[in-house]
Amino acid sequence: MTIMRKTHPLMKMVNHAFIDLPAPSNISGWWNFGSLLGLCLIIQILTGLFLSMHYTPDTLTAFSSVAHICRDVNHGWLIRYMHANGASLFFICLYLHIGRGIYYGSYMYKETWNIGIVLLFLVMATAFMGYVLPWGQMSFWGATVITNLLSAIPYIGSDLVEWIWGGFSVDKATLNRFFAFHFILPFIIAAMAMVHLLFLHETGSNNPLGIPSDSDKIPFHPYYSYKDLLGGAALLAFFFTIVLFFPDALGDPDNYTPANPLNTPPHIKPEWYFLFAYAILRSIPNKLGGVIALVLSILVLALFPLXHTSNQRSLTFRPISQTMFWILVSDLFILTWIGGQPVEPPFIIIGQIASILYFSIILILFPIAGMIENKMLKW
């Protein structure tokens, strides 16, 4: 008898991706984050769908509609806090997933890596537009400041900003279009994630040793399907601890004040997951330069495959590059801290040093460390 999962056109696709997929026998918990990101995306799409049933994208009623969701809708407070903290969880998983890719040299799968970078940009755009929707003070001023950065683009800048705003300031038209984009983008992200997976399955997964694992493969199910279930359970436990006990820990208190164009908050800052990029933006005392640095802070990831000089793929047996990696991680924590501080000494100079270090490690120190390690292996 033929097994249905191996013959049915739809089941065959699922089978090749999640059941009979040959996987390396030694991939660690760091390889769980792909499935955890899928879980985060599902949580965000479902909670977002239910929120959109009660939300109104209008400047006069947006803030009240969010209050109505929290007060009057059955379990509305839960759905709202799941969605808000789900975004933070999404970025925690994203950054760990990218960190894993850098540490173990997964960026050598260029197509998978580049689609991952596109996915990161899409998720960042979605999160930014979602932050505008509750129409609190930080929503309004965050939208004003970040969209205004586009005016730094020579010649077309000011026209572009007015085109995005749909007027001469962030107003009803802006809120409306941001809601439309915020709704559609997660589905585009889901489609791109499938392409990401398609390219990954062309090459197969990398592993902690960074060596070919063709000689030692195991089926994805039951080994990694159960491992993913365990990872998902741990993620949900952590997620609901935050949602139910500390729902506002990661948010900004200013967003509980309705948007007021006549009153600027003392410190305009984005959500915590954008602070590192915001710090890099602010550390350059020139508008266009800052915008370029902001974009490059993410786009620099695309240079990882080009700047790989080592004869080994992963950092497992490369102590100098490992040191560089952990300095980079520490540097990102410093940038995140600086992004949340006011623009005054000593924070300005700390941010500038951390920004220079960020680009130096990736573009200069990593390649040099790789070459030194190659030499050391020959001694």
UniProtKB/Swiss-Prot annotation:
Function of the molecule: Component of the ubiquinol-cytochrome c reductase complex (complex III or cytochrome b-c1 complex) that is part of the mitochondrial respiratory chain. The b-c1 complex mediates electron transfer from ubiquinol to cytochrome c. Contributes to the generation of a proton gradient across the mitochondrial membrane that is then used for ATP synthesis.
Lineage summary: Eukaryota, Metazoa, Chordata, Craniata, Vertebrata
Residues that hold heme b b566 according to the record: 97, 196
Protein name: Cytochrome b
Residues involved in a ubiquinone binding: 201
Organism: Perognathus inornatus
UniProt cofactor(s): heme b
Gene Ontology CC annotations of this record: mitochondrial inner membrane; respiratory chain complex III
Similarity comment: family membership: Belongs to the cytochrome b family.
Keywords associated with the record: Electron transport, Heme, Iron, Membrane, Metal-binding, Mitochondrion, Mitochondrion inner membrane, Respiratory chain, Transmembrane, Transmembrane helix, Transport, Ubiquinone
Family annotation (Pfam families): Cytochrom_B_C, Cytochrome_B
CDD domains to which the protein is assigned, alphabetical: cytochrome_b_C, Cytochrome_b_N
InterPro entries documented for this protein: Cyt_b/b6_C, Cyt_b/b6_C_sf, Cyt_b/b6_N, Cytb/b6-like_sf, Cytochrome_b, Cytochrome_b_C_euk/bac, Cytochrome_b_N_euk/bac, Di-haem_cyt_TM
